[in-house]
Amino acid sequence: MRDDSLLTDVTLIAAGYEVKAHKAVLASCSPYFYAMFTGFDEKNKSKIILRDVDPEALKLLVNYVYTSEVEVTEENVQTLLPAANLMQLSDVKEACCEFLLNQLHPTNCLGIKSFADLHGCLDLLAVTNTYIESHFAEVLDCDEFYALDQEQVCNLISSDTITVPSEEKVYESVIAWVNHDKPNRGQALPRLMEHVRLPLLSRDYLLVSLAINV
């Protein structure tokens, strides 16, 4: 029925892309659209502009409203989840979170953590934090670690539940993070070292390390 535009009464627009739909169908599946079409100015409008929504995500979500089917992929999950979150399509949001959960790896877990935090995916965030703590040594060797800012590194290495073979790994990761952009990160070293358990490092190790890195 929607494909034929039969009796459609609203056009959703995202970045110039248009999708025709029925207000009643959208409102029945989405609290976001229910509120829009019953209590806001948009209830009398035939065209609705959705800002910050990816056009392909809009297409997939409107199709989901009519079919209860959506395919989450590596290519669309980062645009689909925010759009589903906005439209309060909780089943799609959960499907996206489940997909990301199954994709967790030392090379991407920091990015997934940030993404989950940004979009309020609390269960995914909790599982990701646990994953990072248990794979901490591997995470420190991945590119995402070097893209963190100072505050994020502090939060990461200050956890009491991280799993590392020795505190030397944490110390070396801090030095490596600073050296990755030393002109801009050098001043952060003293604060970062506040979170390294220096008493767990041997005196000889520290002396050798300082001689190399000073």
Where do the protein language model's features map onto the residues?
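Canonical BTB/POZ domain core
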Residues: 2-108, 121, 133, 150-183
